[in-house]
């Protein structure tokens, strides 16, 4: 604080002193809080001389915080969160034990209340939707529409719900309603994916299977950017609405939408019938709405911080990079060499080889 008063009271000659030759060459600058006498320090940094900028930056940061260089090539100020950050040393064994217990309890309840045809309501729900029309395409769209209304509706009510019952209770409510509906939609798609009218047949064309496999594999790196913290998903940790900025978010601000579109196009190309096309139409429409709704909710929650991130990111993949609004760090690849992405890689490969098991389990439900 003393440096502020020194800056205001010192003669001009003091401000013209050359910078210290030992000034560190660092790469990151943090947001500088406003000072009651100087106002917004970030505006002073942009309008003052280089020497004044150095004094202001040094006076508002702790000694252990880095200072940016004056080079125009310095990385952009990081406002949001570092996605996929996972520090093993900060993990608590008891939290993961709780996670295992919660997961087991949820799966047990889901099986009794929804999956098991002798006790659950899943089959009755599927039959009710299917009886609306004899068309599997219509049933597929109806299932997606019901899920979309519930899922996006509850997401829009998150702020109100968390104030009324708390973050953890609202997450349990959100998952408890969304999970059975999502599972019903997935199982129906697996069981009826080859119904309907065939539009094209490319499964015997050389190279198509490999291209579809790669597209599906890549899609999962986009699909789950906000579920890296599984402890929040299970409400072991207090759930938060995150403002991610690094990793996949540099490529697109809505990776889940992009991943879903890639997944839908790949599966529709491979299956090639009207049921797959209707499923893709419904899922893509839902995620396009989700992208708009997500921006609206983040803008409401984070205000100017979100608007700043919005200016240097894009919905269309790589658009902000090509336009120069997003500058990738030289070591950008390190934002992907992290345990959550390794876990996604393993789970995606495992899911591919587990396709026969998932199909067999779905067939046995007769949904």
Curated annotation (Swiss-Prot):
GO MF: 9,15,9'-tri-cis-zeta-carotene isomerase activity
InterPro entries, sorted: NnrU_dom (IPR009915)
Keyword Isomerase: yes
Induction line: Up-regulated by light.
Tissue specificity comment: Expressed in leaves and at lower levels in roots.
GO term, biological process aspect, one: carotene biosynthetic process
Membrane topology, record value: Multi-pass membrane protein
Catalytic activity: 9,9',15-tri-cis-zeta-carotene = 9,9'-di-cis-zeta-carotene
Membrane-spanning intervals of the chain: 95-115, 137-157, 172-192, 211-231, 269-289, 339-359
Keywords annotated in UniProt: Chloroplast, Isomerase, Membrane, Plastid, Transit peptide, Transmembrane, Transmembrane helix
EC code: 5.2.1.12
Targeting presequence: 1-58
Keyword Signal among record annotations: no
Localization of this protein: Plastid, Chloroplast membrane
Alphabetized Pfam families for the sequence: NnrU
Phenotype caused by lack of the gene: Lacks carotenoids in the dark and exhibits delayed greening when exposed to light.
GO-annotated cellular components: chloroplast; chloroplast membrane
Biological function: Isomerase involved in the biosynthesis of carotenoids. Catalyzes the cis- to trans-conversion of the 15-cis-bond in 9,15,9'-tri-cis-zeta-carotene.
PANTHER family: 15-CIS-ZETA-CAROTENE ISOMERASE, CHLOROPLASTIC
Protein's name in the database: 15-cis-zeta-carotene isomerase, chloroplastic
């Amino acid at each position: 604080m003393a440096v502020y008063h020194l800056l205001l009271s010192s003669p001009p000659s003091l401000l013209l002193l050359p910078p210290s030759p030992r000034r560190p060459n660092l790469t990151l600058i943090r947001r500088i809080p406003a000072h009651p006498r100087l106002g917004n320090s970030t505006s002073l940094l942009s309008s003052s001389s280089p020497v004044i900028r150095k004094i202001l930056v040094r006076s508002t940061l702790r000694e252990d915080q880095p200072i940016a260089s004056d080079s125009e090539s310095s990385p952009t100020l990081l406002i949001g969160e570092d996605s996929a950050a996972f520090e093993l040393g900060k993990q608590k064994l008891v939290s993961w034990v709780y996670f295992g217990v919660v997961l087991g309890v949820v799966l047990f309840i889901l099986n009794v209340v929804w999956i098991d045809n002798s006790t659950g309501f899943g089959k009755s729900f599927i039959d009710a939707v299917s009886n609306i029309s004899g068309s599997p395409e219509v049933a597929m769209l109806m299932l997606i529409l019901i899920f979309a209304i519930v899922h996006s509706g509850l997401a829009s009510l998150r702020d109100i719900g968390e104030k009324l019952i708390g973050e953890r209770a609202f997450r349990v409510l959100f998952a408890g309603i969304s999970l059975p509906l999502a599972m019903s939609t997935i199982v129906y798609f697996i069981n009826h994916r080859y119904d309907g009218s065939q539009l094209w047949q490319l499964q015997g064309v050389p190279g198509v299977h490999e291209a579809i496999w790669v597209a599906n594999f890549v899609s999962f790196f986009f699909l789950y950017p906000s579920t890296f913290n599984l402890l929040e998903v299970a409400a072991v940790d207090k759930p938060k609405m995150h403002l991610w900025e690094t990793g996949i978010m540099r490529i697109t601000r809505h990776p889940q939408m992009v991943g879903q579109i890639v997944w839908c196009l790949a599966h529709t190309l491979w299956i090639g019938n009207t049921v797959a096309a209707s499923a893709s139409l419904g899922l893509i429409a839902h995620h396009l709405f989700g992208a708009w709704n997500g921006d609206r909710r983040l803008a409401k929650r984070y205000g100017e911080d979100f608007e700043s991130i919005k200016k240097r990111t894009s919905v269309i993949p790589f658009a902000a990079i090509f336009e120069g609004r997003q500058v990738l760090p030289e070591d950008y690849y390190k934002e992907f060499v992290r345990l959550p992405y390794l876990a996604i890689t393993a789970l995606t490969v495992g899911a591919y080889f587990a396709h026969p098991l998932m199909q067999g389990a779905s067939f046995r439900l007769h949904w």
